[in-house]
Structures are given as structure tokens and as C-alpha cells.
Amino acid sequence: MHERFHYKTLLEVKEKCRELSVDLPFAENTSALAAALDIKGFHIPNRLGIAPMEGADSTKEGKPSEYTERRYVREAIGGSGIIWYEAISLVEEGRSSQTQLLINEENLDAFKRMNEKVKEAGVKANGYEPLLIMQSNHSGRYSNPGNRPHPLIAQRNAYLETFRSADDSCIVSDDYL
């Protein structure tokens, strides 16, 4: 049964778990999650993070759209110390779809502006900038630039080809890699 997460207290969550006969451990003291952390020159204001999830809402050129920006601004307002951006393609032919984000020379300023907005939202709402991480991506055999399958592979793999076919013409050069 699916339902929205509407619980306001830990007690409500525990009661629901009992109702469903789900045995989960719960920590009464979660203060460690609020502790800052410094790792190799990066300051993380707390131990909370947003996992990457593709919105598939870029512009045709791969720039962050208003929907992309709004999603990440909202995540910054939520207070997580780390926001891990969704898969961002590094080359046009490596995009999983026409709506996957693409970072290149032409789009770089749009990403810079989005980063500034996200950081500003974090500072305004919580007093700190979240650490932003980019998940760089090449979709390989699942590439669909222009929303048409165009697999690119380093080598043949019989097992993977049962899911998405790719013949020798799809093999990229060592220079491409």
C-alpha cells in the first residue's frame, strides 16, 4: 500500500512500523547528523545529503531549466549539507535523452548561475552553502541523443547486449575514451 509520508514525529513513524510489523532500529539522539565535517578542504555543514535523481527537465541544449533550478533551490532550502546533482552528460552523444543535462562550453554559464542560486538559497534559509557535487555521466550503450538510440561502447559484451543491442559499429576508439 502506498501513502505519502505525512508523519510529524518519530513516535508516529514508530507506530506505523509497529502497525506494519516492520522492525527498524531508531536512534533517539540524531545530533551527529547536525555536526559539520571537513574533508580534504571541503566543508560540509552537516551530515545530511540529497541523493542524485534525474529530473529529465533540461532545455533541449542541455542547460538547467527553471524546473531544474527550482528543484535544487528547494533542496538547498531543505538544509542538506550535500546536494549531489543528477547525471550530467559530458558530451552530446552521451546523453540518455534530449532532456538530460549536458555540460559544455556553451552551457557552463547556465550551470554557474544555477550553482549560485542554490548556494544563495542555502545561505538565506539556513546560514550556510551546501556542498554541491556533480555526477558526470556518459550513457554508453544507453545513449539516446535526440531521443533515438545510439549506443556507444568500449567493447562487446554478450550479457549486456541481451538488454540493449550494440554491434561492432558502436565501438568507440581509444582516442574517444
Regions found by a protein language model. Give the residues of each.
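Conserved, mostly hydrophobic/aromatic
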Residues: I50, E75, G79, M134
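Non-globular sequence segments
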Residues: E129-L131, N137-L177
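An N-cap/entry alpha-helix motif that binds or orients negatively charged groups
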Residues: M1-K40, G55-K63
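Glycine-rich, proline-tolerant flexible connector loops at the mouths of alpha/beta enzymes
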Residues: I82-D109, S136-R148
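N-terminal glycine-rich anion-binding loops that anchor highly charged ligand groups
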Residues: F42-A51, G81-A87
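Short connector loops/turns at beta-strand edges and beta->alpha or beta->beta junctions
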Residues: G55, G81, I88-E93, R156-E161
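Short secondary-structure boundary/capping segments within folded domains
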Residues: D38-I44, V73-E75
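Glycine-rich anion/phosphate-binding loops
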Residues: A56-I77, Q100-E120, N126, N144-G146, ...
